[in-house]
Amino acid sequence: MSLNIFWFLPTHGDGKYLGTSEGARAVDHGYLQQIAQAADRLGFGGVLIPTGRSCEDSWLVAASLIPVTQHLKFLVALRPGIISPTVAARQAATLDRLSNGRALFNLVTGGDPDELAGDGLHLNHQERYEASVEFTRIWRKVLEGENVDYQGKHIQVKGAKLLYPPIQQPRPPLYFGGSSEAAQDLAAEQVELYLTWGEPPAAVAEKIAQVREKAAAQGREVRFGIRLHVIVRETNDEAWAAADRLISHLDDDTIARAQASLARFDSVGQQRMAALHGGNRDNLEVSPNLWAGVGLVRGGAGTALVGDGPTVAARVKEYADLGIDTFIFSGYPHLEESYRVAELLFPHLDVQRPEQPQTGGYVSPFGEMVANDILPKSVSQS
């Protein structure tokens, strides 16, 4: 099975280490453009753009990077309850047209009650999922060209319609991640691809089975994806040393404050991430080559696959064997790590790459010339 491999745009900050300004770098438009263009050239299928008050706006970032990329798809956030589903459908269709069919959408219900209240959304966990179901039903139908009247508990529209359709038909795909029962019910009814954060394979297999069963009961099939960090190096020892360096500036107080902040979240997925490490920096390898160190101070995806190319590829294939076809990766710093993943991991996987222009041989430098006169020795990439 060919795998879809996505990268990540760190619009909430980037650097060499977690939890410190040491080795940090400014994430301005020029830097985001560097990462997007690297991902585009290296053969990543798309990039996930995060959302929330700690991030730049994902829609504006995507729109700004469309003109400077050729093949890359942009996975941007839909925020039920924050915006009208009809307006969101018009925005989605516009972004899809502007990008010539390179727009993908990620339904994000939110998990931080404090942040949501600041955005004007005062619904509890169950109510947010009720509103998300209503939002998504309307959004899908409007994008598919229907005239929509809908009277829901949280959302009511009359005569909602779209005059200018998207490029992708019947509409761009919808991605979504959530671990609660309500989230799985929404996924089974509404989305094309269900995402999970990087839990151990047995836990992921259980979630996939649950969503697959719920979708089948509605006569639907759902694809599956996973969100993970990657620390890949030429040897396993080098990879584990890099993992240790990533958290080498973290002190116990920073970890405790981060975990206290994340504890207020009502996201089941966030609670499951926190349970993997318990706020303790010891015994962070929670499954073979699955390291929970990132989650000590980062909300959301908190685990990384660690190892050399063949080792990480073997773990990726374990998840693929469960039915996962889409992997959304990231690494610190994101520019350099995009190259490491492409160079050290891609050769060991069947990666579904966007079409690239064919050069017909060496028409530009590919490895530094030897003695200014001799082409570098060719090495198989398989």
Swiss-Prot record:
Catalyzes the desulfonation of aliphatic sulfonates. Disulfide bonds: none annotated. GO terms for biological process: alkanesulfonate catabolic process. GO terms for molecular function: alkanesulfonate monooxygenase activity. Keywords: Flavoprotein, FMN, Monooxygenase, Oxidoreductase. It is an enzyme of class 1 (oxidoreductase). SUPFAM superfamilies: Bacterial luciferase-like. Belongs to the SsuD family. HAMAP family: Alkanesulf_monooxygen. It catalyses: an alkanesulfonate + FMNH2 + O2 = an aldehyde + FMN + sulfite + H2O + 2 H(+). PANTHER family: ALKANESULFONATE MONOOXYGENASE, ALKANESULFONATE MONOOXYGENASE-RELATED. The keyword Flavoprotein applies. Its EC number is 1.14.14.5. It holds the Pfam family Bac_luciferase. This is Alkanesulfonate monooxygenase. CDD domains: Alkanesulfonate_monoxygenase (cd01094).
